[in-house]
Amino acid sequence: PYRRQRQMCIRDRHNEYGLIYSLPQTHLDIEVVATKTTRKAGPYYQYAEKYLGIPGAITQDSEEWALSSVKVTPYGVPDPEEQYLMQFKPGGNGYIVLDENGLLLSINTEPVIDSIVSTAPKQKQESPLDNNEYAKVYSAELLMSASTVKMAEVAAKQLYRIRESRLNLVTGEVDELPADGESFKLIIQQLDEQEAALTALFMGTTQTETIIKHFDYIPVEEVTNDIVFRISDLYGIVKPENLSGAPVYLSLKITEEGELPIDNKGNIKKMPKNAVAYAIPGKAEVILSDGKKTLFKENLPIAQFGVVFGLDPSIFTDKKAPSCATFYPQTGAIRQIGK
């Protein structure tokens, strides 16, 4: 969200009129995606190979976590040390656009809005073993069985009958076919669900889901192997101080420091009077690793590794051809400037 300010007057301590805006401090949004895998053993797992002829049944319940991805995105937070007053001439048509936090987005034109696009979590699919849902497909014969081995035998026979019924439907070897296509799909779906539930009694089920957490990191200086979060086998994504997890490290190396512009003679340009301040950010290589492999590596713009300069405010109030400009809210740098 942003707001356009047209001739909005704010009085500062110098008794001048204009609009106060902020340049940003660059923060890093660290998005962490972890996958949780839940395995559940079926009550007849020990009979899977005997009655179904299938090895590899899950023999005990378990949960495990694995790191799926890490993404780092810079974003801007107003820097209280970098607040500026932009003055307006009475009766002028110029305007500036700020975001909801007071960061400068554009002057005399509509802004380009950047946003952090978060990864959507993947929900855990239902399992026939959840809350003993498989009991819904128990036949009367199975319910009357006196022992576990007998129940497994009856469940296997019921499973084979379901498979045979589905095959007969598909091949048309039934006394009466469903009335229409939708009825046929519904019957096949019901048979599939019953087969899945009975198979789960022997083979167990595996469910996966993704959990997403965000961590805020403020670059201040170069760092090596700063722990930003951990991955725990028991709890998934946890904070750095939770020693139950394996650490994930952030290293930051400044690759470019923002410098003040120079003129044709190689001298540093003078700041224009009542300048419209903007940032010339630096850059830093940001690396995240688990100590063995690199999870993320990118060169990112960072406002606090640069400098602040300014534009001559008169270019925005020229009556014949006023200039316009857009800015990056992540760094306060000029995105584009023109007429």
Language-model-derived ranges and their functions:
Residues R4-Q7, R11-K339:
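N-terminal amphipathic/basic membrane-interacting segments and domains
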